[in-house]
Amino acid sequence: MDRWQGIQHVVVVGLGITGLSVVNYLRKYHPSVTVQVIDTREAPPGQEQLSSDVALHRSGWNLEWLLNADLVVTNPGIALATPEIQQVLAAGIPVVGDIELFAWHVDTPVIAITGSNGKSTVTDLSGVLANAAGVKAAVGGNIGVPALDLISPDVELYVLELSSFQLETTSSLKLKAAAFLNLSEDHMDRYQGMEDYRQAKLRIFDHAETAVVNADDTQTFPDHAAHLQVVTFGVEQAAQFSLAQHQGREYLFARDEAVMACAELSLVGRHNVANVLTVLALLDSAGVNFRLALDALKSYTGLTHRCQVVADNHGIKWVNDSKATNVASTLAALSGLKIEGQLYLLVGGVGKGADFTPLAPVLATLPVQLCCFGVDGHQFMPLHPSARFYDSMESIIRSIRPQLKSGDMVLLSPACASFDQFKNFMARGDIFAQLARQYA
């Protein structure tokens, strides 16, 4: 069936790197289609890269364009509940995202990953190990390169990170294997509650052959699994991909096979052991022989902005975990820590309506000074008696620098989004790393 039959006029809502990837894809593969772009921002990012023959409407909506479209492609950041998008849907005009266009185009095997935390590490490591095993993999989606920019005839496996926002507008993505890593409170400003958020994530299994789920978090299990093969991973509960003692050491196990000692991993933290087990389960389900890539697994140190040591001088560790944009990410970082001295924990930013109280019992067990900043930083103040509020990240570091001593750790794991004071979490992490090197 030709999905494009009768589609002559496409409106792309939201520019940026995803919107640009949609425009470039349409111009390359569907040159006869007329493309218009709507972006409600005054200066949409990427507008200077837009071809002069693509009409752009800025600083607001253009309902005339929307209601005359044959297809509307929205940016994942735009909720389907937005009144203008609701009008489009009410008019019977299909609304999709870039991942749905990708799904219409490719017939090469695809694996995909969703979850509240750990998605980027699992996605990146899956690509690294697939390539090391001799399978040409292309990695992207919600991480790095937009999915449509990955399309190439020589790719043998696509590895996509998918957010709940992307899954909302995706309905026909066929997957060799799909992983749902975990579920914790996030984006409560967008969803009606946790079950609403969970249902968006579960869409990843709609057309998957294998569901890779977390035995330690049953909320990741599909509600309807008749069409699926279900494979489990876990570090606490019994699972097909799990941990067990072998020759006196803790080993990663794939089904009943001892794969590698945990001590041989370069990755730090218990949450990363779970991430590795997920990758093994995904690749195995997709027919990739991960055993050919164990050297690459041993040497893999993880992604920037995710529990990354950016400076280690005079015995003081500076750790950039800027990607921790919700409470569960920060809890994961704290659970994997080994600290000899004092922990200086930097938290705050845009809270997205989250409840931060689950941090309190964990903080109570740690030698911590809580350093709060950002628009919702004050919400962390009741969590620990050491809490102090600062007007910026730099003022925190200037203030604590004279008291730092060997064995201490300065950890940026904010449990919040960054866009109150920074362009994005990467910019926040880069500035932290720069300050760490300056003051270390």
From Swiss-Prot:
One of its GO terms (molecular function) is UDP-N-acetylmuramoylalanine-D-glutamate ligase activity. One of its GO terms (cellular component) is cytoplasm. It catalyses: UDP-N-acetyl-alpha-D-muramoyl-L-alanine + D-glutamate + ATP = UDP-N-acetyl-alpha-D-muramoyl-L-alanyl-D-glutamate + ADP + phosphate + H(+). This is UDP-N-acetylmuramoylalanine--D-glutamate ligase. Cell wall formation. Catalyzes the addition of glutamate to the nucleotide precursor UDP-N-acetylmuramoyl-L-alanine (UMA). InterPro entries: Mur-like_cat_sf, Mur_ligase_C, Mur_ligase_C_dom_sf, Mur_ligase_cen, MurD. It comes from the Bacteria. Its main location: cytoplasm. It is an enzyme of class 6 (ligase). Pathway: Cell wall biogenesis; peptidoglycan biosynthesis. It is found in: Cytoplasm. The lineage of its organism: Bacteria, Pseudomonadati, Pseudomonadota, Gammaproteobacteria, Vibrionales. Its EC number is 6.3.2.9. It comes from Vibrio cholerae serotype O1 (strain ATCC 39315 / El Tor Inaba N16961). ATP binds at G115, S116, N117, G118, K119, S120, T121. GO terms for biological process: cell division; cell wall organization; peptidoglycan biosynthetic process; regulation of cell shape.
